[in-house]
Amino acid sequence: MTSATKTNNSGSISSPIVVALDYANKDAALAFADQVSPQDCRLKVGKEMFTLYGPELIRDLHQRGFDVFLDLKFHDIPNTTARAVAAAAELGVWMVNVHASGGARMMSAAKEALLPYGAQAPLLIAVTVLTSMDSEDLRDIGITISPAEQAERLAKLTWDCGLDGVVCSAHEAVRLKQVCGEDFSLVTPGIRPQGSEAGDQRRIMTPEQAVAVGVDYMVIGRPITQSPDPEKTLREILASLTKVA
C-alpha cells in the first residue's frame, strides 16, 4: 500500500529548511532542484504547481532524492479529506497538510486514513492561521480573537486529534510548544533571512530567530529560489543556524 517512490520519513535529513517551489513551470522547478542537495533541504509543492503538473512532478523530485511536502491544505468533508490524504500517502510524500478549521471530525478522519501506512505514512499537519493574515483579516471573517489566540485554539484541537503538528507563525512557536509538547512539530512559513523582502507575509522571522523559539521546519521560498547561487544561499542559512544556542 506504500509507494515505491517514497524517499524517507525517517528523519535522516537533518536540515530544518523546506524550500517552496513557487515556479511558473516544471522545467524551472527541476532546474532549481538540480542546483541544490537533498541533504540540505526538503522541497514544498503547492497548489499551483501540483495543479499544473500533478503526481509526475512529485515523482521527478523523488527521483532526485528529495523529501516532498505536498502543501495542498485539504479542507472538505471528512470522507473526501481522508481520501485525499490517503492519495498523498500513495504518492510517497514526506508531509501533507489539512486546514485545522475543517474541524475535529475532518482531522480525525484524515489521521485514520494514514494508519494502514504505518511508519511509511507522511507527517500529517494542520494549518492554523495563515501567516498572511493579521487581526483585521480575522475580524473580517468573524473571528474576534488575535491570530496568536486563534492559532493556539486550533493547535490544541489538532493535537487532540492526534496529528503530528501544525503550520503556524514562528511568533506562536514558544507558546504552542508549551501547550502541545516538544514532540509536536511546528512548520513555519514567513521565514526571511536578514535583508530579504517580506513579500506577502506579514508575520515574519529570520531563520535564526525561528530556530531559537522552537520551530522544527521553516519554509523559505524566494530568498533561496531567486538567489543567483541557491546552494550557496542555502548553505549560508544552514551555517547561521549552527550559531543558535
Curated annotation (Swiss-Prot):
Pathway: Pyrimidine metabolism; UMP biosynthesis via de novo pathway; UMP from orotate: step 2/2. One of its GO terms (molecular function) is orotidine-5'-phosphate decarboxylase activity. One of its GO terms (cellular component) is cytosol. It is an enzyme of class 4 (lyase). It catalyses: orotidine 5'-phosphate + H(+) = UMP + CO2. Its EC number is 4.1.1.23. PROSITE patterns: OMPDECASE. The active site is at K73 (proton donor). InterPro entries: Aldolase_TIM, OMPdecase, OMPdecase_AS, OMPdecase_bac, OMPdeCOase_dom, RibuloseP-bd_barrel. Keywords: Decarboxylase, Lyase, Pyrimidine biosynthesis. GO terms for biological process: 'de novo' pyrimidine nucleobase biosynthetic process; 'de novo' UMP biosynthetic process. Substrate binds at residues 22, 44, 71-80, 131, 192, 201, 221-222. Homodimer. Catalyzes the decarboxylation of orotidine 5'-monophosphate (OMP) to uridine 5'-monophosphate (UMP). Belongs to the OMP decarboxylase family. Type 1 subfamily. HAMAP family: OMPdecase_type1_B (MF_01200_B). This is Orotidine 5'-phosphate decarboxylase. It comes from Yersinia pseudotuberculosis serotype O:1b (strain IP 31758).
